[in-house]
Amino acid sequence: MNPLSIAQDELKAIQSSQPIVWLNRNYQNPASAPATPNVDALYAAEARLKRFAPLLQRLFPELEPSHGLIESSLIQADRLNNRINPVGGLLFLKADHDLPVAGSVKARGGIHEVLCFAESLALTHGVLKDVDSDYCTLASQSARDLFSKHTITVGSTGNLGLSIGVIGSALGFKTVVHMSSDAKEWKMERLRKRGVRVVEHDADYGAALEAGRLETIADPCGYFVDDERSPNLFMGYAVAAKRLQAQLEALNIKVDADHPLFVYLPAGVGGAPGGITYGLKHIFNDHVHCFFAEPVQSPCMLLGMAGAPGAAPTSIYELDLKNRTDADGLAVGAASQWVCDATRNLLSGVYTATDEQLYQQLYLLKDLENIEVEPSAAIGCLGPAMLTSEAGQKYLDSHRLSHRMENSVHIPWLTGGSFVPDEEYQRYLAKAVNVST
Protein backbone atom coordinates (compact mmCIF):
# COMPACT_ATOMS: atom_id res chain seq x y z
CA MET A 1 0.00 0.00 0.00
CA ASN A 2 1.28 3.48 -0.87
CA PRO A 3 2.17 5.82 2.01
CA LEU A 4 -0.92 7.85 2.85
CA SER A 5 -1.21 11.31 4.33
CA ILE A 6 -3.65 10.01 6.93
CA ALA A 7 -3.21 10.03 10.71
CA GLN A 8 -3.34 6.70 12.52
CA ASP A 9 -6.63 7.48 14.25
CA GLU A 10 -8.14 8.52 10.91
CA LEU A 11 -6.98 5.28 9.33
CA LYS A 12 -8.57 3.25 12.12
CA ALA A 13 -11.84 5.13 11.65
CA ILE A 14 -11.78 4.45 7.90
CA GLN A 15 -11.05 0.76 8.39
CA SER A 16 -13.91 0.44 10.88
CA SER A 17 -16.35 2.28 8.58
CA GLN A 18 -16.72 5.23 10.95
CA PRO A 19 -17.58 8.65 9.47
CA ILE A 20 -14.60 11.00 9.48
CA VAL A 21 -13.54 14.42 8.25
CA TRP A 22 -10.15 14.33 6.54
CA LEU A 23 -8.34 17.59 5.83
CA ASN A 24 -6.11 17.65 2.78
CA ARG A 25 -2.50 18.25 3.82
CA ASN A 26 -1.64 19.14 0.22
CA TYR A 27 -4.29 21.84 -0.15
CA GLN A 28 -2.72 24.87 -1.86
CA ASN A 29 0.48 22.92 -2.62
CA PRO A 30 0.89 23.04 -6.44
CA ALA A 31 3.65 20.43 -6.38
CA SER A 32 1.07 17.85 -5.29
CA ALA A 33 -0.86 18.18 -8.57
CA PRO A 34 1.51 17.24 -11.43
CA ALA A 35 -1.32 16.77 -13.96
CA THR A 36 -3.02 20.18 -13.62
CA PRO A 37 -4.85 20.84 -16.92
CA ASN A 38 -4.59 23.98 -19.01
CA VAL A 39 -7.50 26.29 -18.25
CA ASP A 40 -7.91 27.03 -21.96
CA ALA A 41 -9.61 23.64 -22.20
CA LEU A 42 -12.36 24.87 -19.86
CA TYR A 43 -13.18 27.78 -22.13
CA ALA A 44 -13.00 25.52 -25.18
CA ALA A 45 -15.55 23.20 -23.57
CA GLU A 46 -17.82 26.13 -22.75
CA ALA A 47 -17.65 27.32 -26.37
CA ARG A 48 -18.28 23.81 -27.72
CA LEU A 49 -21.43 23.40 -25.63
CA LYS A 50 -22.69 26.72 -27.00
CA ARG A 51 -21.97 25.59 -30.59
CA PHE A 52 -23.95 22.41 -30.04
CA ALA A 53 -26.87 24.13 -28.27
CA PRO A 54 -29.10 24.49 -31.38
CA LEU A 55 -28.59 20.81 -32.22
CA LEU A 56 -29.29 19.71 -28.66
CA GLN A 57 -32.46 21.80 -28.64
CA ARG A 58 -33.58 20.00 -31.80
CA LEU A 59 -32.77 16.55 -30.41
CA PHE A 60 -34.22 17.19 -26.95
CA PRO A 61 -37.32 19.45 -26.91
CA GLU A 62 -37.06 19.80 -23.11
CA LEU A 63 -34.05 22.06 -23.76
CA GLU A 64 -36.13 24.67 -25.58
CA PRO A 65 -36.50 26.96 -22.50
CA SER A 66 -32.71 27.04 -22.06
CA HIS A 67 -32.03 27.34 -25.81
CA GLY A 68 -30.11 24.08 -25.87
CA LEU A 69 -27.97 24.55 -22.78
CA ILE A 70 -28.05 21.70 -20.25
CA GLU A 71 -28.22 23.51 -16.92
CA SER A 72 -29.88 23.20 -13.52
CA SER A 73 -31.41 25.64 -11.07
CA LEU A 74 -29.76 27.07 -7.97
CA ILE A 75 -32.37 26.77 -5.23
CA GLN A 76 -32.31 28.76 -2.01
CA ALA A 77 -33.33 26.33 0.74
CA ASP A 78 -34.05 28.30 3.92
CA ARG A 79 -36.08 25.60 5.69
CA LEU A 80 -33.38 23.02 5.11
CA ASN A 81 -30.74 25.56 6.09
CA ASN A 82 -32.37 26.02 9.49
CA ARG A 83 -32.17 22.26 10.07
CA ILE A 84 -28.76 21.24 8.68
CA ASN A 85 -26.54 24.31 8.92
CA PRO A 86 -25.19 25.07 12.42
CA VAL A 87 -22.38 27.34 11.20
CA GLY A 88 -24.41 30.21 9.73
CA GLY A 89 -24.84 31.73 6.31
CA LEU A 90 -27.07 30.94 3.34
CA LEU A 91 -27.79 27.53 1.84
CA PHE A 92 -28.42 26.90 -1.85
CA LEU A 93 -28.93 23.55 -3.56
CA LYS A 94 -27.37 22.97 -6.99
CA ALA A 95 -30.14 21.00 -8.60
CA ASP A 96 -28.24 18.68 -10.92
CA HIS A 97 -30.63 15.94 -9.77
CA ASP A 98 -33.03 17.66 -12.16
CA LEU A 99 -30.69 18.26 -15.11
CA PRO A 100 -32.57 17.73 -18.37
CA VAL A 101 -31.69 14.94 -20.81
CA ALA A 102 -29.96 12.59 -18.35
CA GLY A 103 -31.20 13.55 -14.86
CA SER A 104 -27.83 13.72 -13.14
CA VAL A 105 -24.54 15.62 -12.95
CA LYS A 106 -23.18 13.08 -15.46
CA ALA A 107 -25.14 14.89 -18.16
CA ARG A 108 -22.43 17.56 -18.03
CA GLY A 109 -19.30 15.53 -18.62
CA GLY A 110 -20.80 12.59 -20.45
CA ILE A 111 -22.62 14.63 -23.06
CA HIS A 112 -19.63 16.92 -23.60
CA GLU A 113 -17.39 13.90 -24.19
CA VAL A 114 -19.68 12.48 -26.87
CA LEU A 115 -20.05 15.89 -28.50
CA CYS A 116 -16.25 16.16 -28.70
CA PHE A 117 -16.10 12.85 -30.56
CA ALA A 118 -18.99 13.75 -32.87
CA GLU A 119 -17.44 17.13 -33.68
CA SER A 120 -14.07 15.57 -34.46
CA LEU A 121 -15.60 12.98 -36.78
CA ALA A 122 -17.80 15.56 -38.53
CA LEU A 123 -14.89 17.93 -39.14
CA THR A 124 -12.62 15.12 -40.35
CA HIS A 125 -15.20 13.75 -42.79
CA GLY A 126 -16.45 17.12 -44.06
CA VAL A 127 -19.93 16.96 -42.54
CA LEU A 128 -18.93 20.19 -40.80
CA LYS A 129 -16.74 22.60 -42.73
CA ASP A 130 -15.46 24.33 -39.59
CA VAL A 131 -16.56 25.25 -36.08
CA ASP A 132 -18.59 28.16 -37.45
CA SER A 133 -20.83 25.78 -39.42
CA ASP A 134 -24.47 25.10 -38.61
CA TYR A 135 -24.26 22.27 -36.07
CA CYS A 136 -27.85 21.26 -36.77
CA THR A 137 -26.31 19.58 -39.82
CA LEU A 138 -25.33 16.82 -37.40
CA ALA A 139 -28.98 15.76 -37.26
CA SER A 140 -28.92 15.04 -41.02
CA GLN A 141 -29.00 11.55 -42.48
CA SER A 142 -25.43 11.89 -43.79
CA ALA A 143 -24.20 12.67 -40.28
CA ARG A 144 -26.17 9.79 -38.78
CA ASP A 145 -24.78 7.44 -41.42
CA LEU A 146 -21.26 8.50 -40.42
CA PHE A 147 -21.91 8.17 -36.70
CA SER A 148 -23.62 4.78 -37.09
CA LYS A 149 -20.31 3.27 -38.24
CA HIS A 150 -18.79 4.00 -34.83
CA THR A 151 -19.39 2.47 -31.42
CA ILE A 152 -19.11 4.42 -28.18
CA THR A 153 -18.42 2.29 -25.11
CA VAL A 154 -18.36 3.20 -21.42
CA GLY A 155 -18.12 1.47 -18.04
CA SER A 156 -20.43 2.81 -15.34
CA THR A 157 -22.20 2.33 -12.03
CA GLY A 158 -25.27 3.87 -13.65
CA ASN A 159 -25.53 7.60 -14.27
CA LEU A 160 -22.57 8.10 -16.61
CA GLY A 161 -23.76 5.18 -18.69
CA LEU A 162 -27.20 6.74 -18.81
CA SER A 163 -25.87 10.08 -20.08
CA ILE A 164 -23.55 8.49 -22.68
CA GLY A 165 -26.29 6.16 -23.86
CA VAL A 166 -28.87 8.92 -24.22
CA ILE A 167 -26.71 11.33 -26.23
CA GLY A 168 -24.91 8.60 -28.20
CA SER A 169 -28.12 6.98 -29.39
CA ALA A 170 -29.72 10.36 -30.12
CA LEU A 171 -26.87 11.21 -32.51
CA GLY A 172 -26.96 7.79 -34.18
CA PHE A 173 -23.92 6.11 -32.65
CA LYS A 174 -23.94 2.47 -31.66
CA THR A 175 -23.59 2.64 -27.89
CA VAL A 176 -22.50 0.02 -25.37
CA VAL A 177 -22.64 0.46 -21.60
CA HIS A 178 -20.85 -1.96 -19.27
CA MET A 179 -22.69 -1.78 -15.95
CA SER A 180 -21.26 -2.76 -12.57
CA SER A 181 -23.16 -4.95 -10.12
CA ASP A 182 -24.22 -1.78 -8.25
CA ALA A 183 -26.19 -0.43 -11.21
CA LYS A 184 -29.95 -0.10 -10.80
CA GLU A 185 -32.16 -2.18 -13.07
CA TRP A 186 -34.28 0.83 -14.05
CA LYS A 187 -31.23 2.63 -15.43
CA MET A 188 -30.32 -0.37 -17.56
CA GLU A 189 -33.90 -0.74 -18.80
CA ARG A 190 -34.04 2.94 -19.73
CA LEU A 191 -30.93 2.47 -21.86
CA ARG A 192 -32.23 -0.68 -23.56
CA LYS A 193 -35.38 1.17 -24.59
CA ARG A 194 -33.13 3.62 -26.47
CA GLY A 195 -31.41 0.80 -28.35
CA VAL A 196 -28.28 0.83 -26.20
CA ARG A 197 -26.53 -2.50 -25.61
CA VAL A 198 -26.14 -3.02 -21.87
CA VAL A 199 -23.58 -5.51 -20.58
CA GLU A 200 -24.16 -6.46 -16.94
CA HIS A 201 -21.21 -7.44 -14.74
CA ASP A 202 -21.31 -9.36 -11.49
CA ALA A 203 -18.42 -7.22 -10.26
CA ASP A 204 -17.61 -3.66 -9.25
CA TYR A 205 -17.12 -0.48 -11.25
CA GLY A 206 -13.43 -1.17 -11.94
CA ALA A 207 -14.25 -4.47 -13.63
CA ALA A 208 -16.98 -2.90 -15.77
CA LEU A 209 -14.61 -0.12 -16.80
CA GLU A 210 -11.86 -2.56 -17.80
CA ALA A 211 -14.28 -4.73 -19.77
CA GLY A 212 -15.41 -1.69 -21.75
CA ARG A 213 -11.82 -0.67 -22.37
CA LEU A 214 -10.88 -4.12 -23.69
CA GLU A 215 -13.93 -4.30 -25.95
CA THR A 216 -13.05 -0.95 -27.51
CA ILE A 217 -9.43 -1.93 -28.16
CA ALA A 218 -10.71 -4.77 -30.34
CA ASP A 219 -12.93 -2.44 -32.41
CA PRO A 220 -11.18 -0.24 -35.02
CA CYS A 221 -14.24 2.03 -35.09
CA GLY A 222 -14.65 2.03 -31.33
CA TYR A 223 -14.40 4.99 -28.96
CA PHE A 224 -13.99 4.45 -25.23
CA VAL A 225 -15.22 7.00 -22.71
CA ASP A 226 -12.60 6.62 -20.00
CA ASP A 227 -14.08 7.86 -16.75
CA GLU A 228 -10.70 7.46 -15.04
CA ARG A 229 -8.60 9.64 -17.33
CA SER A 230 -10.68 11.78 -19.66
CA PRO A 231 -9.95 15.52 -19.94
CA ASN A 232 -13.09 15.88 -22.08
CA LEU A 233 -15.33 14.53 -19.33
CA PHE A 234 -13.48 16.60 -16.75
CA MET A 235 -13.89 19.87 -18.64
CA GLY A 236 -17.55 19.20 -19.31
CA TYR A 237 -18.02 19.15 -15.56
CA ALA A 238 -15.76 22.17 -15.06
CA VAL A 239 -18.06 24.34 -17.19
CA ALA A 240 -20.62 24.02 -14.38
CA ALA A 241 -18.53 26.47 -12.37
CA LYS A 242 -18.97 29.18 -15.01
CA ARG A 243 -22.71 28.62 -14.99
CA LEU A 244 -22.82 28.73 -11.18
CA GLN A 245 -20.89 32.00 -11.18
CA ALA A 246 -23.57 33.56 -13.40
CA GLN A 247 -26.36 32.22 -11.16
CA LEU A 248 -24.76 33.64 -8.02
CA GLU A 249 -24.22 37.01 -9.70
CA ALA A 250 -27.88 37.07 -10.80
CA LEU A 251 -28.85 36.65 -7.14
CA ASN A 252 -26.38 39.33 -6.01
CA ILE A 253 -24.51 36.74 -3.94
CA LYS A 254 -20.96 37.84 -3.25
CA VAL A 255 -18.04 35.42 -3.10
CA ASP A 256 -14.93 37.06 -1.67
CA ALA A 257 -12.71 37.06 1.42
CA ASP A 258 -15.60 38.19 3.63
CA HIS A 259 -18.18 35.96 1.93
CA PRO A 260 -16.65 32.48 1.65
CA LEU A 261 -18.30 29.82 -0.50
CA PHE A 262 -18.42 26.17 0.61
CA VAL A 263 -19.33 23.49 -1.92
CA TYR A 264 -20.04 19.86 -0.98
CA LEU A 265 -19.64 17.35 -3.80
CA PRO A 266 -20.52 13.63 -3.81
CA ALA A 267 -17.54 11.68 -5.14
CA GLY A 268 -17.17 8.36 -6.91
CA VAL A 269 -14.21 7.83 -9.22
CA GLY A 270 -13.68 11.60 -9.12
CA GLY A 271 -14.31 13.05 -12.58
CA ALA A 272 -17.44 15.08 -11.81
CA PRO A 273 -16.43 16.53 -8.42
CA GLY A 274 -12.86 16.98 -9.62
CA GLY A 275 -13.90 18.88 -12.73
CA ILE A 276 -16.36 21.06 -10.83
CA THR A 277 -13.73 21.80 -8.18
CA TYR A 278 -11.20 22.70 -10.86
CA GLY A 279 -13.63 25.17 -12.42
CA LEU A 280 -14.69 26.67 -9.10
CA LYS A 281 -11.12 27.21 -7.93
CA HIS A 282 -10.23 28.85 -11.24
CA ILE A 283 -13.08 31.32 -10.85
CA PHE A 284 -13.22 31.94 -7.10
CA ASN A 285 -9.65 31.04 -6.09
CA ASP A 286 -9.14 30.86 -2.32
CA HIS A 287 -12.64 32.17 -1.62
CA VAL A 288 -14.25 28.80 -2.43
CA HIS A 289 -13.73 25.73 -0.27
CA CYS A 290 -14.56 22.38 -1.88
CA PHE A 291 -15.17 19.19 0.07
CA PHE A 292 -15.82 15.77 -1.40
CA ALA A 293 -18.33 13.45 0.29
CA GLU A 294 -18.18 9.65 0.19
CA PRO A 295 -19.83 6.61 1.80
CA VAL A 296 -17.89 5.06 4.68
CA GLN A 297 -17.63 1.85 2.66
CA SER A 298 -16.26 3.54 -0.48
CA PRO A 299 -13.85 6.39 0.42
CA CYS A 300 -11.79 5.98 -2.73
CA MET A 301 -11.17 9.70 -3.37
CA LEU A 302 -10.05 10.21 0.22
CA LEU A 303 -7.46 7.47 -0.25
CA GLY A 304 -6.50 8.81 -3.67
CA MET A 305 -6.04 12.39 -2.51
CA ALA A 306 -4.10 11.19 0.54
CA GLY A 307 -1.66 9.34 -1.70
CA ALA A 308 1.60 10.54 -3.18
CA PRO A 309 1.55 12.58 -6.41
CA GLY A 310 1.96 10.31 -9.42
CA ALA A 311 1.23 7.16 -7.41
CA ALA A 312 -1.57 4.75 -8.20
CA PRO A 313 -4.40 5.42 -5.72
CA THR A 314 -4.85 2.99 -2.86
CA SER A 315 -7.87 0.74 -3.30
CA ILE A 316 -10.50 0.59 -0.58
CA TYR A 317 -10.14 -3.19 -0.70
CA GLU A 318 -6.61 -2.85 0.67
CA LEU A 319 -8.24 -1.54 3.86
CA ASP A 320 -10.68 -4.47 3.91
CA LEU A 321 -13.66 -2.29 3.03
CA LYS A 322 -16.45 -3.96 1.06
CA ASN A 323 -17.74 -1.18 -1.23
CA ARG A 324 -21.30 -1.95 -0.13
CA THR A 325 -23.54 1.10 -0.12
CA ASP A 326 -26.98 2.15 -1.34
CA ALA A 327 -25.24 5.18 -2.88
CA ASP A 328 -24.64 3.22 -6.09
CA GLY A 329 -23.10 6.15 -7.96
CA LEU A 330 -20.41 6.45 -5.31
CA ALA A 331 -19.60 2.73 -5.05
CA VAL A 332 -16.09 2.87 -6.50
CA GLY A 333 -13.08 0.92 -5.26
CA ALA A 334 -10.23 3.09 -6.52
CA ALA A 335 -10.09 6.76 -7.50
CA SER A 336 -8.90 8.19 -10.79
CA GLN A 337 -5.17 8.80 -10.51
CA TRP A 338 -5.40 11.48 -13.17
CA VAL A 339 -8.13 13.41 -11.33
CA CYS A 340 -6.18 13.17 -8.06
CA ASP A 341 -3.05 14.47 -9.75
CA ALA A 342 -5.04 17.23 -11.47
CA THR A 343 -6.79 18.59 -8.38
CA ARG A 344 -4.96 17.47 -5.24
CA ASN A 345 -3.90 21.04 -4.39
CA LEU A 346 -7.45 22.38 -4.88
CA LEU A 347 -9.42 20.16 -2.51
CA SER A 348 -10.02 21.29 1.07
CA GLY A 349 -10.93 17.85 2.38
CA VAL A 350 -13.18 14.81 2.31
CA TYR A 351 -15.86 13.65 4.72
CA THR A 352 -17.52 10.25 4.86
CA ALA A 353 -21.01 9.22 5.93
CA THR A 354 -23.06 6.11 6.64
CA ASP A 355 -25.97 5.07 4.46
CA GLU A 356 -28.25 5.85 7.41
CA GLN A 357 -27.02 9.45 7.36
CA LEU A 358 -27.67 9.65 3.61
CA TYR A 359 -31.23 8.50 4.09
CA GLN A 360 -31.77 11.04 6.87
CA GLN A 361 -30.77 13.81 4.45
CA LEU A 362 -32.91 12.31 1.69
CA TYR A 363 -35.86 12.52 4.09
CA LEU A 364 -35.13 16.14 5.04
CA LEU A 365 -34.87 17.18 1.38
CA LYS A 366 -38.31 15.72 0.72
CA ASP A 367 -39.91 16.85 3.97
CA LEU A 368 -38.61 20.43 4.03
CA GLU A 369 -38.03 21.31 0.36
CA ASN A 370 -40.10 18.72 -1.55
CA ILE A 371 -36.99 17.68 -3.46
CA GLU A 372 -36.60 14.04 -4.49
CA VAL A 373 -33.08 12.67 -4.96
CA GLU A 374 -31.35 9.30 -4.99
CA PRO A 375 -29.31 8.41 -1.87
CA SER A 376 -25.92 9.32 -3.33
CA ALA A 377 -27.11 12.86 -4.06
CA ALA A 378 -28.12 13.52 -0.46
CA ILE A 379 -24.64 13.17 1.01
CA GLY A 380 -23.71 16.78 0.24
CA CYS A 381 -26.31 18.02 2.72
CA LEU A 382 -24.09 16.80 5.58
CA GLY A 383 -21.46 19.37 4.63
CA PRO A 384 -22.35 22.35 6.83
CA ALA A 385 -22.58 20.19 9.98
CA MET A 386 -19.24 18.62 9.06
CA LEU A 387 -17.64 22.01 9.69
CA THR A 388 -18.56 21.78 13.38
CA SER A 389 -16.40 18.67 13.83
CA GLU A 390 -12.95 19.00 15.37
CA ALA A 391 -11.35 18.79 11.93
CA GLY A 392 -13.90 21.20 10.46
CA GLN A 393 -13.23 23.77 13.17
CA LYS A 394 -9.50 23.32 12.63
CA TYR A 395 -10.01 24.10 8.94
CA LEU A 396 -12.05 27.22 9.64
CA ASP A 397 -9.54 28.46 12.21
CA SER A 398 -6.47 27.80 10.09
CA HIS A 399 -7.98 29.68 7.14
CA ARG A 400 -9.32 32.51 9.32
CA LEU A 401 -12.91 31.77 8.41
CA SER A 402 -14.58 31.28 11.80
CA HIS A 403 -15.61 34.92 12.19
CA ARG A 404 -16.88 35.08 8.59
CA MET A 405 -19.36 32.23 8.72
CA GLU A 406 -22.40 34.49 9.17
CA ASN A 407 -21.70 35.75 5.65
CA SER A 408 -20.89 32.34 4.18
CA VAL A 409 -22.70 30.52 1.38
CA HIS A 410 -23.09 26.72 1.35
CA ILE A 411 -23.95 24.63 -1.72
CA PRO A 412 -24.58 20.89 -1.51
CA TRP A 413 -24.43 19.56 -5.07
CA LEU A 414 -27.47 17.35 -5.68
CA THR A 415 -26.15 14.94 -8.28
CA GLY A 416 -29.06 12.74 -9.37
CA GLY A 417 -32.64 11.72 -8.84
CA SER A 418 -35.26 13.09 -11.23
CA PHE A 419 -35.23 10.01 -13.48
CA VAL A 420 -35.71 7.58 -10.58
CA PRO A 421 -39.01 5.69 -11.09
CA ASP A 422 -41.60 6.64 -8.49
CA GLU A 423 -41.87 3.18 -6.94
CA GLU A 424 -38.08 3.07 -6.55
CA TYR A 425 -38.10 6.50 -4.91
CA GLN A 426 -40.90 5.42 -2.58
CA ARG A 427 -38.66 2.57 -1.41
CA TYR A 428 -35.90 5.10 -0.73
CA LEU A 429 -38.33 7.34 1.12
CA ALA A 430 -39.74 4.51 3.24
CA LYS A 431 -36.23 3.61 4.32
CA ALA A 432 -35.49 7.29 4.96
CA VAL A 433 -38.59 7.69 7.13
CA ASN A 434 -37.65 4.57 9.05
CA VAL A 435 -34.19 5.86 10.00
CA SER A 436 -35.37 9.44 10.60
CA THR A 437 -38.36 8.97 12.90
Curated annotation (Swiss-Prot):
Keywords: Lyase, Pyridoxal phosphate. Pfam families: PALP. It catalyses: D-serine = pyruvate + NH4(+). The modification N6-(pyridoxal phosphate)lysine is found at residue 106. The keyword tRNA-binding does not apply. GO terms for biological process: D-serine catabolic process; isoleucine biosynthetic process. It comes from the Bacteria. This is Probable D-serine dehydratase.
